[in-house]
């Protein structure tokens, strides 16, 4: 099975709204640190890894508005899709008191790899959805 860094719901829905959920998942793709950033399961279930409940809320809102929605399929601990590419907090080594050991030795090449694997495909798909209509309103 091929890893997909995002999922889209209701791509053909007609509303001009576009719902985004940057922190929908606490998933570490298998091709990043072998799927394990060295953070225990309890911490991966906390807000440090994703926004708990945001996925369901965004999905319900999109359905209610008859709008498309896009969801990141990777944890913000892998690379944060809600940051600019040059943001120093793009790949956190410490988050809310938890050491992210899988990011500890991540260098510029690993950062670029994660940008290409997760971040850029997500933002490219988001831009394509937004461009469908000239008057799209993005709700994040």
Locate each region found by the language model.
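N-terminal catalytic or cofactor-binding beta/alpha core of small enzyme domains
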Residues: 1-138
């Amino acid at each position: 099975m091929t890893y997909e860094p995002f999922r889209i719901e209701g791509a053909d829905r007609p509303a001009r709204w576009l719902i985004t959920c940057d922190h929908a998942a606490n998933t570490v793709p298998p091709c990043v640190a072998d799927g394990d950033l060295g953070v225990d399961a309890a911490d991966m279930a906390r807000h440090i890894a994703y926004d708990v409940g945001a996925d369901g809320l965004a999905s319900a809102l999109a359905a209610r508005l008859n709008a498309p929605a896009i969801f990141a399929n990777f944890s913000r601990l892998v690379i944060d899709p809600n940051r600019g590419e040059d943001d120093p907090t793009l790949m956190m080594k410490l988050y809310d008191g938890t050491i992210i050991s899988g990011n500890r030795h991540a260098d510029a090449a690993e950062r670029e790899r994660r940008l290409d694997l997760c971040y850029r495909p997500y933002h490219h798909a988001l831009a394509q959805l937004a461009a469908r209509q000239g008057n799209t309103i993005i709700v994040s």
